[in-house]
Amino acid sequence: MSESNKAIRQPIISVLGHVDHGKTTLLDKIRGTAVAAKEAGGITQHIGASEIPLEVVKEICGPLLEQLDVEITIPGLLFIDTPGHEAFTNLRRRGGALADIAILVIDIMEGVMPQTEEALRILRRYRTPFVVAANKVDRVPGWKSHEDTPFLESFQKQSPEVQQRLEEKVYELIGQLHQHGFQAERFDRVRDFTRTVAIVPTSGVTGEGIPELLMVVTGLAQRFLEEQLKIEVEGPGKAAILEVKEEPGLGHTVDAILYDGIIRTGDTIVIGHPEEPIVTRVRSLLKPKPLDEMRDPSDRFRKVDEVTAAAGVKISAPELEEAVAGAPLRVVGEDEDVEEVVREVQEEVEEVTIETDQEGIIIKADTLGTLEAVVGEFKEKDVPIRKADVGDITKKDVIEAHAVAEKDPLLGVIVGFNVGVTEEARELADEYDVDIIIDDVIYELVEKYEEMVEKRIERERRKRLDELVRPGKIKVLPGYIFRQSKPAIVGVQVLAGVIKPGYPLMREDGRELGEIKQIQMHGEPIKEAKKGQEVAISIEGPIVGRHFEEGDILYTDVPSEHAKLMFEEFKDLLTEDELEALKEIAEIKRKEDPFYGM
């Protein structure tokens, strides 16, 4: 393929950040600023994306671009319209994210928050270069806004106190990013953009800092991504599905971001799917009508014959109802074999969905993109994964998780991102005691899983503790001898710890007495009695008056190995009075056996 057939496409830019940090406002402001520069050509609206042509970038940045000291050959910037993690993860290509650059929006007053941390993890995993927009500078106490001006210009006009305040906030942010493994600095102090994350203070409300933000993004793309942005102009199109939608009069359509090559009406396309790829033919390609032509809301699209990367396009074709977001889409070229393209696409999907761990958790997500992100997050925590798939949680998933739980209860779990659970699955999960964890925030899914593991470990420990003879101390109540022998039945008060049927008893001098057969309260049998309770117990073996008397103190006869386990492994699960009773029992026992409980 000759270089003459290649062209440089626009870098694809995704905006990420914590909820309420101003992603949408900033993105709207960038678009609004571009629309306002209509002398230079304004903005080109795509499906799911907005293109800011280079001329418009130049108009907004003014002389700032000259500071880059590099010839700008990219034709513009393509911003993904939907901010957030989900759009970012759905726009995926083999080996990484589709976005060439991300803008991570952080509220300068709040700093790094949980979803910021998640965004940083995703960006690191996908190795996506990013710029930090330290947003909401207009909220810095005392800041005087200057609409749509470059940040540095506005900064110079602030009082020394306000400048100091902003510097402190930027340095706090630098420190937080450093804790997450990223070296960062204010953009005008960055010497090496390959090693240092640039922080651009911005305001999505006033537009301050947007010229520098666009300058830094343009410079990054031009200087470091030029090779990556070279595309084969006439090559078969490659795209990622952003969304699957049903449109009136069109049926099921897919909104896709084309990142390489060309797609034409009539082309055969292959779309990846967890079951098997969808092979279909493009019925029509649609782009949004310009705002000034959109008179009828139901007639929002115009048909085009072909679309070249990078672009957002709506594709209408048969058999798209099964398509899923995050799936790869490939055009079958004239000299390509359909089967070969199907195989390549399937391999790409299987990289995400097929797991090799025999025992592991089951992950379900709403799209291939989010599935890949969730799988990545759990792999980072070294959690084995048995199956990862797209779609709601079904009975089949529960049966599979139950089979895993039989061998390892901590892995017999289903994790769902943004999915539903069928009624059948819910009922079966209750019956089989299979945990289902659902959330629409990835980091919370991982946290919930870790909490569940802790609870299960705790439950397992309590279960093991309950299999031991636990420490108990009782007093035989005077006047409550109901039967003297075969079995002896007496009233007792539990002074410390716990007693249960089956527990052996001993006297204060360590002599064995016999086993508790039954415990009754108000004439009804009970499973255990704890400190403070007064109950009747039957004891097989001893005779009241010969082996023990009313008023005597008795203890549970805890075997040495049980005491050892309680001292070493389960001490934290014992109540204070149980621990006290255990110490007293050990003291009695060690008169005969100095190594008791050791």
UniProtKB/Swiss-Prot annotation:
Residues 203-205 are annotated as: G5. Belongs to the TRAFAC class translation factor GTPase superfamily. Classic translation factor GTPase family. IF-2 subfamily. Residues 17-24 are annotated as: G1. Function in general translation initiation by promoting the binding of the formylmethionine-tRNA to ribosomes. Seems to function along with eIF-2. The keyword Protein biosynthesis applies. Keywords: GTP-binding, Initiation factor, Nucleotide-binding, Protein biosynthesis. It comes from the Archaea. Residues 42-46 are annotated as: G2. It comes from Methanopyrus kandleri (strain AV19 / DSM 6324 / JCM 9639 / NBRC 100938). NCBIfam families: aIF-2 (TIGR00491), PRK04004.1 (NF003078), PRK14845.1 (NF011418), small_GTP (TIGR00231). Residues 81-84 are annotated as: G3. This is Probable translation initiation factor IF-2. The gene is infB. InterPro entries: EFTu-like_2, EFTU-type, P-loop_NTPase, Small_GTP-bd, T_Tr_GTP-bd_dom, TF_aIF-2_arc, TIF_IF2, TIF_IF2_dom3. Residues 8-226 form the tr-type G domain. It holds the Pfam family GTP_EFTU.
